[in-house]
Amino acid sequence: MGKPTGFIEYLRETPLDRSPSERVRDWKEFHHQLDEKSLRNQAARCMDCGVPFCHTGKAMSGGASGCPVNNLIPEWNDLVYRGLWREALERLHRTNNFPEFTGRVCPAPCEGSCVLGINAPPVSIKNIENSIIERGFEEGWVVPEPPKTRTGRKVAVVGSGPAGLAAAQQLNRAGHSVTVLERADRPGGLLMYGIPNMKLDKHEVVMRRIHQLEQEGIRFVYNAEVGDNYEAQMMRRDFDAVVLCTGATVPRDLPVEGRSLQGVHFAMDYLTDATQALLGKGPKSAMIEAKGLDVVVIGGGDTGTDCVGSAMRQGCRTLTQFEIMSKPPTERAADNPWPEWPRVYKTDYGQEEAAAKFGRDPRAYLTTVKRLVGDEAGRVKELVTVEVGWEIDAQGRSVPVEKPGTERRQPAQLVLLAMGFTGTEESLPLDLGIELDERRNIRADTVSYTTSVPGVFAAGDCRRGQSLVVWAIAEGRGAARECDRWLMGSTDLP
């Protein structure tokens, strides 16, 4: 390493964000970048580890530990420290097709497994990664790389989220003719409509990369829902292989009285609507909008946070977020040792913004909704909540148990359900004759990504279930490699 004592000499530093009161006035990204000297100092904090844990991804205790795409983190940290930015970019692109996505929206399990993080703040890997790729775009180093020759084989990639885009780029660079079939009106899947613009800019970040893929020769077809207006069997006939990257899009519902009232929406419907409105699609009168309303978000994950941030920008009157789990500790608990992902209390951007306006953290823990109450017009006007505790049942499972006498009424004219996803939509797998697993995801081998139908592969959330963007990119790359091997008998793809 260029600076073996950097972790002793420099403290962790991350860029300042725009203030909550300022950034809620628009939908622009709110993270700043560090200057070059500061970035080089941060890269110098990367230790000369005997056994680095940051760069090797694995599932551990229900979460991710290390980098799922196996980024060469110690190598590009050292190159940044030495000012060799172009070489750092080359190392970064060896393993990650889209570091501008992960550098913005990844929760950074690499930092959770950083060796320095055992007893000090970890290296700011995520920020360094994003700085490398943005430097690459600024300098003109990120250019289309079309294949020199074509194999004559045609591959359909269904879905243009992170898994689909990674699979498409890898297969195209192997020389295959790739068509991406996307049912929405724009590319990106989750990247376009599932993540708000202030976290991932649609024009300056997502479409910038899409344009590169198009220039490399990848064809995108929009408003193409395979199994509906685009026949599944026609796709099988027209292409030599298919890679399914359709995501885990079936939302977990709230089966309580009043669920059918107007004003109760799934989080993804709300987030999609907000982005479409921002991009100028659809009549404003049809929007799901939070302006002037008492908003309740049910669910405490990243999607819930995105709903909070979006509602703040739309001008909600009040905002409350209910979480059925207990409040995490401020430091790792004994049953959450390094290098597991640290399950600790944090305040994300949406909660910061709500606290700045309303003077309190919007989250209420160990709380669930018992029923929704409507007005004479059939619109939700309030909900009834109850506090819960967690107990072990006869089967040894941890289950929530209501606490008597803790019912409360909460005003709400907009209720957003952000409780995760239960699996992939089943119509397309059924049309193709593909087996599903016990979790209602597409059954595909964890090494070969092959489904029960020869020539059809599956990657990303539709195979592994709800997960991270970085896992989706890793799976898209893996499925592309195995698809290329199936088509050609061997492969040079990583």
Could you tell me what each predicted segment is?
Residues R12-E13, D17-K37, Q42-R45, G50, ...:
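C-terminal catalytic lobe of FAD-dependent flavoproteins
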Residues C46-C49, C54-K58, G63, C67, ...:
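Short cysteine clusters
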Residues E87, T149, K154-V158, I210-V256, ...:
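Feature captures the FAD/FMN-dependent oxidoreductase FAD-binding
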Residues S131-T149, V206, H211-D228, P251-Q314, ...:
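Glycine-rich dinucleotide-binding loop and its adjacent helix/turn
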Residues S260-G292, E391-Q466:
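FAD-site-proximal beta/loop scaffold in flavoenzymes
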